[in-house]
């Protein structure tokens, strides 16, 4: 049996999230179905992807990582007439079978001890907002949340700073069965993307076209892991602060008392993108997976 690491990206707009669900189009279901066709393993449970970070319906990923265990003989059969290694052949075939909203960026033999979910050191998410400071670009409808209010980025950053460190995010997340909402946030900040005009040499003002993300508000958050709905709920709370509906003291109170209730529900999914998954050195993978499986406490 060979464990393979798969790096991929996807536009989540037309998917019901990552996780396979009967009767729903999902990223996991689409990739697994293609793998079964390539390997001629029709059993639905024969090839199961384990993912670094499950994304909800409408959420995107520019760098997602998963692993799958494939029988050695089955992997060898992927070559067929190709003058490629088995792994290269599988990547080529899988890439060709993907719809336009999924891209396979790489397949490799995973090092010993690698687990896409439990070996990960940290995950990076970015949430994008178009507020009243910038004219609305309809091309962003699937990739940014829109508001006709101008948001106070200084107040939003004051709230975001309170999330740094090890905390119980019970006010902003749902725990998995038997799990907790304790997580360690390493980075959390808001910034406005500078205007980046696409202006070539010798072009006049009429060609002064801003890059598509110019002026957007972006929330970047890095943590060892995230509980369900955690990022979108934190964004939603920061937005309430940025609009002046709530103050930073209210946000601080939610951090102090981890109680889930309606005022800290998740914001719309389309603005959220999983941007990066980081892993330790190969010789630290197994130990990392063992540590992260332990139930966290404060």
Swiss-Prot record:
Mention one GO biological process in which this protein takes part, according to its record: tRNA pseudouridine synthesis
Statement: the UniProt record of this protein carries the keyword Isomerase? yes
EC annotation?
A: 5.4.99.12
So what does this thing catalyse? Answer: uridine(38/39/40) in tRNA = pseudouridine(38/39/40) in tRNA
Q: List the transmembrane segments.
A: none
- List the active-site residues: 56 (nucleophile)
**Sites where the protein binds substrate:** 125
Look up keyword tRNA processing and say if it applies.
yes
What GO MF annotations does this protein's record show? RNA binding; tRNA pseudouridine(38-40) synthase activity
Entry keyword set: Isomerase, tRNA processing
Q: How does it assemble?
A: Homodimer.
Q: What does the UniProt function comment say about this protein?
A: Formation of pseudouridine at positions 38, 39 and 40 in the anticodon stem and loop of transfer RNAs.
Protein family according to the UniProt entry? Belongs to the tRNA pseudouridine synthase TruA family.
- PANTHER family cross-referenced by the UniProt entry: PSEUDOURIDYLATE SYNTHASE, TRNA PSEUDOURIDINE SYNTHASE-LIKE 1
Q: What is this protein called?
A: tRNA pseudouridine synthase A
Q: Which organism is it from?
A: Bifidobacterium animalis subsp. lactis (strain AD011)
From which lineage does this chain's organism come?
A: Bacteria, Bacillati, Actinomycetota, Actinomycetes, Bifidobacteriales
């Amino acid at each position: 049996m060979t464990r393979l690491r798969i790096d991929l990206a996807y536009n989540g707009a037309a998917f019901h999230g990552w996780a396979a669900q009967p009767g729903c189009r999902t990223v996991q279901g689409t990739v697994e179905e293609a793998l079964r066709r390539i390997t001629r393993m029709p059993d639905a449970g024969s090839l199961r992807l384990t993912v670094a970070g499950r994304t909800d319906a409408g959420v995107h990923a520019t760098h997602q990582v998963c692993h799958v265990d494939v029988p050695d003989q089955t992997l060898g059969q992927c070559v067929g007439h190709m003058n490629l290694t088995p792994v290269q052949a599988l990547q080529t075939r899988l890439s060709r079978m993907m719809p336009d909203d999924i891209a396979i960026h790489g397949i490799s033999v995973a090092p010993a001890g690698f687990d896409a979910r439990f070996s990960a050191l940290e995950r990076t998410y970015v949430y994008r907002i178009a507020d009243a400071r910038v004219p609305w670009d309809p091309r962003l409808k699937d990739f940014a949340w829109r508001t006709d209010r101008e948001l106070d980025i200084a107040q939003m950053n004051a709230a975001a700073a309170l999330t740094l460190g090890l905390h119980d995010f019970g006010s902003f997340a749902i725990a998995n069965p038997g799990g907790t909402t304790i997580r360690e946030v390493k980075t959390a900040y808001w910034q406005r993307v500078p205007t980046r005009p696409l202006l070539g040499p010798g072009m006049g003002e009429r060609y002064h076209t801003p890059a598509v993300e110019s002026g957007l508000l972006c929330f970047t958050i890095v943590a060892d892991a995230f509980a369900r709905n955690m990022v979108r709920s934190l964004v939603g709370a920061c937005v309430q602060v940025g609009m002046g509906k709530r103050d930073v003291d209210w946000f601080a109170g939610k951090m102090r008392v981890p109680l889930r209730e309606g005022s800290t529900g998740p914001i719309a999914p389309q603005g959220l993108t999983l941007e990066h998954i980081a892993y330790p050195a190969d010789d630290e993978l197994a130990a990392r997976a063992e540590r992260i499986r332990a139930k966290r406490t404060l």
